[in-house]
Amino acid sequence: MKLLVAVDFSGPTDLILRVARRLAKSLDASVWVVHAAEPDPDFVGYDTGPEVVRGQVAKELREEHRSLQRYTDQLREAGVDAKAILVRGSTVEALLAMAEKQGADLIVVGSHGRGMVAEMILGSISQGLIRAGRWPVTVVPVKNQKE
């Protein structure tokens, strides 16, 4: 069995990983820890050139990849087969593409609340994954966790 665990490096990420670890151990599953990084900007600001933007984006991607590696190291130390994947793009679409590519059996995601107005306009990651209807989705409630 394969679990795809979506993380965004916010405060509740540790809780989401703890739940994923318990699930992986009880199901004898491997874990793919996935973060969907921001897609390329549509335009470059007037004050910064493309090289500056590319350099900053590259630095952020390296930092995000290091964080993913730390998470997978922690899971491996707990006896879970874990790998890290950093993708770029719209979060829901990127996660669905990775679930397909990796042959995921279950997606684990946090229930980050953005507030009612933002959620009405933008929707939520968990809702988007559930609406896709192709994989079971475990939503970890994180409302009372510190961000």
Question: What kind of feature is each model-predicted range?
Answer:
Residues 48-52, 101-103, 125-126:
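Short, hinge-like loop/turn segments at secondary-structure boundaries
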Residues 1-51:
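Small/aliphatic-rich secondary-structure junction motif
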Residues 32, 83, 138:
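Conserved beta-strand positions in the Rossmann-like core of class I SAM-dependent methyltransferases
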Residues 9, 106-128, 146-147:
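Glycine-rich, Arg-bearing micro-motifs that act as flexible, cationic patches
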Residues 35, 110-112, 142:
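Short secondary-structure boundary segments
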Residues 131-142:
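Short, acidic/small-residue loops that bind anionic groups at enzyme active sites
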Residues 51-66:
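A short acidic, glycine-rich active-site loop
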Residues 73-107, 144-147:
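Structural beta-alpha unit
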